[in-house]
Amino acid sequence: MSKGCRTNTRLAARVTTALAVGALAATSIGGWSSAAGPRAAGIPTPATMTVVPAVADINPLTGIEGLPTGPVIAVKIDDTALGRPSLGLEKADVVYIEEVEGGLTRMVAMFASATPNVRAVRSVRSSDIELLGQYGRIILVASGGAGVTLRKLDASTLHSVINDRRQVGFFRDPSRPAPYNVVSELAKVSAAIEADGVRDVGFAWAGDDPRLADAKPAATVSTKVGATAVGFVWDAKLARYVRTVAGQPILTESGDPVAKPNVLVQFCEITVDSSVIDSNGRPTMFTESVGTGQVVLFRGGKRITGTWSRPSLDAPTTFTDTAGKPLLFAPGGAFVALARPGTPT
């Protein structure tokens, strides 16, 4: 296929103009610290919470100036101790955490701002096809998948790049054990496949939000996806939530923390997908990302509750507070944990 990026009809991000950024209290973890924080922009007045269409140079997946010119690439990444440290994950714009089989989790990492080498690439699930429909005709990179899942993927609008099919941009890291050693060279994938670039998938970005003044403090986030504990700690020096395991920060191979300014816990109906059974006899799970449900947004060491709504496969997801106003994400990307309804958070 030809090199390049297909022009999108749906325009970039939602963002508000900058005025001020409030100072935030510090929490430090695991000895990690940084004097630098991500770019942020405030909103005009506390009375104004209008979300306006973005100018063309704002990345709708981060809210940061500089519109990516290449295709969006989604990568399935391992989320267990055996797959750590990951490679390249810190360069992702948005990272979804989803339930698979046996209570375990995998990640779907969205790359538009950068095209690093990424490890450990793992297999696709049917849930991914539904989740990624809102991004358009983008690229999905995976190590493989069950036959029935690959047939569904082939029938979808996604451009699949699968290691088991000996497609472009894969190699195995000899320092890591299989199956945790599959690496995708995203620069090669981006150059080889024509696919959609960034589009609005529902994130509204603003460097400040007057609702935070009265919001509940949330220096830590503790929830579950499946049977897997998913935790984060707010680091004010980084101005980000750092993902943790047993209270310790998760670092990538480069030594960078796995961190984003926002953590969204999105409560979704999750059902058994009996069409796929793993080698231990366990069915995989299907996360319903089309529909409606509750959310909790964590940003700036605070938490705000609300709802999500996505009416169809190709529609963006709308996030609103309890009054129906858009939830505002801090520029810099987000984690999205797809949890079962009622999961303590």
What are these regions (language model features)?
Residues 42-43, 48-94, 101-111, 115-345:
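A surface/extracellular/periplasmic glyco- and lipid-processing/surface-interacting theme
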Residues 2-37:
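Secretory targeting and sorting signals
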